[in-house]
Design a protein with these regions (language model features):
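N-terminal export signals
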Residues: 1-19
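Bacterial lipoprotein signal-peptidase II cleavage site
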Residues: 18-29
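Early extracytoplasmic/lumenal segment of secretory-pathway proteins
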Residues: 37-112
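A structural signal for short loop-to-beta-strand junctions that line the ligand-binding cleft
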Residues: 98-105, 120-161, 186-188
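Short beta-strand->loop
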Residues: 120-131, 149, 268-281, 290-293
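Ligand-binding pocket segment of bilobal, Venus flytrap-like solute-binding proteins
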Residues: 189-193, 197, 201, 208-276
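Conserved C-terminal helix/tail region of periplasmic/extracytoplasmic solute-binding proteins
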Residues: 241, 346-378
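Mature extracytoplasmic/periplasmic domains
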Residues: 285, 290-350
């Protein structure tokens, strides 16, 4: 998969199969209170009868799709991917005929996608609810002026553990590694994404996970392939519910997916969530419209609809990620949503987050990921 993407993009642009990574986002506290913004989605024009998504799995409340159809008419179809690379490869291979209207890339991929003609330039006048976003989540470094993207949500990477499998508390990435090699050996999952997998080594050692230093990449490969991979049962980008169903004892996970696992179990006290230290990941996912979409009015209508504060709050309850809408934290607290410490992070936690990058090391990380899969014990 990675090779097809690398070959498809001109100019030697390297894209990894990273699940989520970005390079600018707001801090841990919202700095806003109470405001609710616009509450009615304004139609961008007569909508078509269909809207096609290429999307991360289980990433929006199914009831919201039905609500959109009931209110505006377009039926929705969703195909899913597990990594940015998989999504980009399919768009490139389709040569503008994918049939998709909306895709949801992570921030750092947007400049290359836009430069290679995969994304529409947005007319923000057709998205009046854009004003509901906090300014911390607009005008990101990888898309100044929101020319091609609008924040969907943002989050980080940690783990979820079954405490009947690993009784010792896991506080750091080194604790995670020790548990993976010890009581959870053969019963762990890691994210099915090269940069998140290799990130474990860099984060545990307090290193820059966007490094291009050959010696550091060699050390990462030795650890990932020889030390960690033999203990891995599965490469799974959505392990939260699977773990609480007994499929894993320890899983690397994005915060919202881990929260979905806790919400799905009758005994959440059996499990523990943790954010890695000394460092871990920061990412932002974004609504974008595919170049020459078959249903452009419906695509604009959807983005405007999902930025409605009421709709955004409903979606947050489902997926467990901060949507960046003004007042959403206060609204979630008022609604007594569960496990909000997994959604809204403290400033101290955010201080440990580091953004990813697309650079010359990405292909090497893909190679390490492939070698790790071959060496995995599962």
């Amino acid at each position: 998969m990675a090779g097809s993407v690398v070959a498809a993009f001109s100019g030697g642009i390297l894209l990894s199969a990273c699940g989520k990574s970005n390079n600018t986002v707001g801090g841990g506290t919202t700095g806003t209170t109470g405001a609710t913004g616009t509450t009615g989605a304004t139609s961008p024009g007569p909508m078509e009868d269909t809207l096609n998504f290429y999307h991360w799995a289980a990433y929006d409340d199914p009831k919201i799709f039905k609500k959109f159809t009931d209110q505006y008419g377009p039926s929705t179809k969703i195909d899913v991917y597990a990594s940015n690379e998989e999504m980009i490869a399919k768009l490139v291979a389709a040569g503008g005929t994918s049939g998709y209207d909306i895709v949801v890339p992570t921030g750092v991929y947007i400049p290359q996608m836009a430069a290679n003609g995969l994304l529409e330039e947005l007319d923000l006048a057709r998205i009046p609810n854009f004003k509901n976003l906090q300014t911390a989540y607009t005008n990101q470094a990888w898309d100044p002026g929101n020319k091609h993207s609008v924040c969907k949500d943002w989050g980080s990477t940690g783990w979820i553990v079954d405490k009947t499998v690993v009784s010792t508390p896991i506080k750091t990435w080194n604790d995670f590694i020790a548990a993976a090699k010890g009581p959870a050996s053969g019963n762990i999952s890691v994210l099915d994404a090269p940069t998140d997998l290799t990130g474990i080594y860099f984060w545990a050692n307090g290193l820059d996970w966007t490094t291009t230093d050959p010696a550091q990449l060699d050390a990462c490969e030795k650890f990932t392939v020889n030390d960690l991979a033999p203990h891995v049962k599965a490469f799974d980008s959505y392990p939260g519910i699977a773990l609480t169903q007994g499929n894993y004892g320890l899983s690397q996970a994005w915060n919202g997916d881990a929260r979905q696992g806790l919400l799905a179990t009758k005994d959440p006290s059996r499990y523990a969530w943790g954010l890695g230290t000394p460092l871990t990941e920061l990412w932002m996912d974004n609504w974008t419209i595919v170049k020459n979409p078959p249903h452009p009015n419906a695509a604009y209508g959807w983005i405007n609809f999902i930025l409605d504060p009421t709709i955004s709050l409903q979606d947050l309850e489902f997926h467990g990620y901060n949507t960046g809408i003004t007042g959403v934290k206060e609204a979630a607290q008022a609604a007594n949503f569960k496990f909000l410490d997994m959604v809204f992070f403290s400033d101290a936690q955010v201080a440990t987050f580091r953004a990813g990058a697309v650079n010359s090391a990405n292909q090497r990380l893909v190679d390490i990921w492939n070698k790790a899969k071959a060496a995995a014990g599962g």
